[in-house]
Design a protein with these regions (language model features):
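N-terminal Rossmann-like FAD-binding beta1-loop-alpha1 element of flavoenzymes
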Residues: 1-19, 336, 340
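Conserved N-terminal/central alpha/beta ligand/cofactor-binding core
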Residues: 22-109, 207-222, 247
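Helical element adjacent to the flavin cofactor pocket in flavoenzyme catalytic cores
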Residues: 91-118, 122-123, 163-169
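Short, well-ordered coil/turn residues at beta-beta hairpins
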Residues: 122, 127-129, 212, 308-312
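Glycine-rich loop(s) and the adjacent beta-strand/alpha-helix scaffold that form part
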Residues: 123-185, 325, 331-334
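An anion/pyrophosphate-binding glycine-rich loop and adjacent beta-alpha core
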Residues: 163-165, 169-274
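A glycine-rich dinucleotide-binding beta-alpha-beta segment and adjacent secondary-structure elements
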Residues: 269-319
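Catalytic phosphate/nucleotide-handling subdomain of diverse soluble enzymes
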Residues: 304-341
């Protein structure tokens, strides 16, 4: 999202733009997402949900997102729904493939399968490589020693290229570099890409969460359950058990009832054990996007001549969770505008 939005905005402002895409297609992890671009309905709720984030950055995203979403629709991005399904948030669900195509039409065709290397002297550079969740080494360094056991719930190319380049150019790390957004997934041999959303085990608030040694998760459980999945990621094998009482099986989640989610886990081979008046499901931490990254100002600046947006930029969702697509959209546009001065 961030790179394509920056390119489209820069072209709109009359700039010549080159886009270097490491992967074999455009769209990054946006194409694998549900396509919902949202913000918290109320500013105070945003601060409650992400209390450790940079307040100035958060204010920019919160105040500019609605106009940025209108800009996307003006480019022809197809809207699927104008509701998020969450009373705490407002936003729009786009068709991810159609959104990608609209941004490409407005911007430029990326040079696929190409890594940038070193920046070009005197040419503004916007880093939008999607974070570092695809690098086992960087995840091990900053997030968890259990990096090899995590399931990558994202594209395989976002492996810290932007982070490393920005640091080498004089940038610094944001707060929250140890945090990430992800989901608990069925602990099975493989979770297919088309199961990243539908197989999510999002019912920790109805369960007792314990690791293999019987140690319980005792922390808070927010609506997105990111605190839980981060805890799971630091347990042996990045695994845990959700133990659900029978009384909670009919509870509704955003992906279906708890019983339906458990059945999906069973069907893909996860261990599901029936116990006395409860069901236990083995889950593994899936990492979608790192929360921390390069420290930026409200225009996305990292260092002289270098900007960052999306997963490469940290500081917006620190301490919780907010729409990564929203941050990428707003800050990608802002970075392009500032880079063109």
């Amino acid at each position: 999202m961030a790179g394509l939005a920056a390119a489209a905005r820069a072209r709109e402002l009359g700039a010549r733009v080159d886009v270097y895409e490491k992967g074999d297609r455009s769209g990054g992890s946006m194409l694998l997402s549900s396509g919902v671009v949202w913000r918290y309905r109320e500013w105070d709720e945003f601060r409650r949900q992400c209390p450790d984030g940079d307040e100035a950055l958060q204010r920019v995203v919160h105040e500019e997102l609605d106009d940025a979403v209108e800009w996307l629709t003006s480019l022809g991005a197809p809207v699927v729904e104008v509701e998020t399904g969450n009373p705490l948030t407002v936003g729009v669900r786009f068709d991810p493939a159609g959104l990608c195509e609209a941004l490409l039409r407005a911007g430029v065709e990326p040079r696929l399968g190409t890594q940038l290397g070193q920046p070009f002297d005197g040419v503004p550079l916007i880093l939008a490589t999607g974070g570092f969740q695809g690098s086992r080494d960087l995840v091990r360094t900053y997030v968890t020693p259990e990096a090899d056991s995590l399931v990558l719930r994202a594209n395989p190319w976002s492996s810290g290229d932007g982070l490393l380049l920005g640091l080498a150019a004089g940038g610094s790390l944001s707060d929250g570099v140890e945090q990430f957004y992800g989901r608990a997934l069925p602990a099975t041999t493989e979770v297919p890409v088309d199961g990243f959303i539908g197989l999510a085990q999002l019912y920790a608030r109805f369960a007792e969460v314990i690791n293999e040694a019987g140690e319980r998760y005792e922390g808070p459980v927010g609506w997105a359950e990111v605190e839980v999945v981060q805890w799971i990621a630091r347990q042996p094998g990045a695994r845990a058990w959700f133990v659900v009482p029978d009384s909670a099986l009919a509870e509704e989640t955003r992906y279906g009832t708890v019983a339906e989610l458990i059945e999906r886990a069973r069907r893909v081979g996860a261990r599901v054990e029936r116990r006395d008046k409860e069901t236990a499901v083995e889950v593994v931490a899936g990492i979608t996007q790192t929360t921390g990254g390069l420290r930026i100002d409200t225009h996305g600046r990292v260092a002289d001549g270098i900007w960052a947006a999306g997963g490469d930029a940290g500081g917006v969702a620190t301490g919780g969770y907010m729409s990564n697509l929203a941050s990428a959209l707003v800050m990608g546009r802002r970075a392009a505008e500032d880079a063109l001065g």
